[in-house]
Design a protein with these regions (language model features):
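Predominantly a Rossmann-like dinucleotide-binding segment in NAD(P)-dependent oxidoreductases
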Residues: 12, 139, 146-226, 365
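Glycine-rich phosphate/pyrophosphate-binding beta-alpha loops
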Residues: 200, 248-256
Length: 376
């Protein structure tokens, strides 16, 4: 059993507190406003025997009162967590600009760290933190929980199992219409903006899905409703094999494109939303004869004529089994030396550097070379 304390008990930290205290972990944030009460699924591990909530710490009196109402121990200051010998792990869920100092002080106090994303403000901060992790021998674990999103795992399975033939384009979009939350996320000094908020998730997952060098990146940042930080972006990436990817985040989209779109030489897959409705349309056989021209708008086309029903088949999206709490299980196993980290600081560093390359592209309006080929 590991004792875990949480610094930062706002929306994310409060959700973590409820989930850890209840034993449901990532599976169900029971009791969080807007979330349904529920039970662990058969594939989900109860983390109750693995992790115990030691307490929380927050500077907001309202959040302190909230924690006390739930019966959680409240530390008066972060230093009190550092000084508590019973605490094994500190979960950092404060605004982004505080992560570096909190992580460093935690590891130097003998604690392991589970850190909310983005783990740092930039790659230089993360390099410092990883150096301290190596120096102290403590685990620094980036909390990239969206690797366990069902939609991503379905997309990854389709990409890997050859259903679509050679996949040549992957697109993933996260879209809303409410702008950026009106808190620290809208402030540059606190690490706000959608690149750091959602870009870190989309890039993390894409780099897990496609184990290749990223050779080029081009990006546009949007400032539709905000001037200080980006409220969205559209990023184009090219991998060494020629595969391309488009990642897009929008906070002023009142109608949404599909969450995932994968195009391959033998088919196409669409995942509509987080409920994972969608389909796979796969080539059944090539037609020997040319298509008949169709009227499209003001002219005829053979190229864009739809295929006959006999040449393609439409399939449901594949099913995936996964443990929502694998991150917590792996965290404990990594601390105890039973397994390597699934989410590593080195991978987070690559993601951070790629985000910086994307921002540089947006600022210069130019393609940025990212990971050039090694000399022969």
């Amino acid at each position: 059993m590991k004792n875990i304390a949480i610094v930062g008990c706002g929306g994310m930290g409060g959700g973590h507190a409820v989930a850890i205290a209840s034993g449901t972990g990532n599976a169900i944030w029971a009791g969080v406003p807007g979330q349904k009460e529920g039970k662990l699924q058969p594939t989900d591990t109860d983390i109750g025997p693995l992790l115990s909530l030691a307490g929380v710490c927050d500077i907001d009196p309202a959040r302190v009162a909230w924690a006390r109402e739930r019966g959680y121990r409240v530390y008066d200051a972060y230093q009190d967590i550092l000084d508590d010998p019973a605490v094994d792990i500190i979960l950092i869920a404060t605004p982004n600009h505080l992560h570096k100092e909190e992580a460093i002080s935690a590891m130097r106090a003998g604690k392991h760290v589970l850190c909310e994303k983005p783990v740092m403000m930039d790659s230089h901060e993360l390099e410092e933190v990883l150096a301290v992790a190596a120096e102290t021998g403590k685990v620094f674990y980036p909390r990239q929980n969206r690797r366990w999103d069902k939609d991503f795992l379905i997309a990854k399975k389709i990409f890997e199992d050859g259903t679509l033939g050679r996949v040549f384009n992957i697109e993933c979009r996260v879209q809303g219409s409410r702008g950026i939350p009106g808190d620290w996320r809208a402030k540059k000094e606190f690490g706000g903006g959608m690149m750091l908020d959602w870009g870190v998730h989309l890039l993390d997952r894409l780099l897990v899905m496609v184990p290749e060098r990223v050779t080029r990146v081009f990006c546009d940042l949007t400032h539709v409703l905000t001037g200080e930080v980006d409220d969205g972006f559209k990023m184009h990436l090219t991998f060494e094999s020629g595969l391309t990817a488009v990642l897009e985040v929008g906070t002023c989209h009142f109608a949404a494109l599909p969450l995932w779109f994968l195009a391959g030489s033998q088919g196409t897959a669409v995942i509509d939303n987080w409920d994972c409705t969608g389909r796979v349309v796969r080539l059944h056989s090539w037609e020997d004869k040319d298509a008949k021209p169709i009227l499209a708008g003001a002219g005829l086309t053979k190229t864009m004529a739809p295929r006959g029903d006999s040449s393609v088949e439409t399939l449901p999206l594949p099913q995936v089994d996964f443990d929502n709490n694998e991150l917590y299980l792996n965290l404990v196993d990594a601390i105890d030396g039973r397994a390597p980290q699934i989410v590593t600081g080195e991978h987070a560093l690559r993601v951070m550097r790629l985000m910086e390359a994307a921002v540089s592209s947006a600022e210069t309006h130019a393609v940025v070379e990212f990971e050039p080929a090694l000399p022969v």
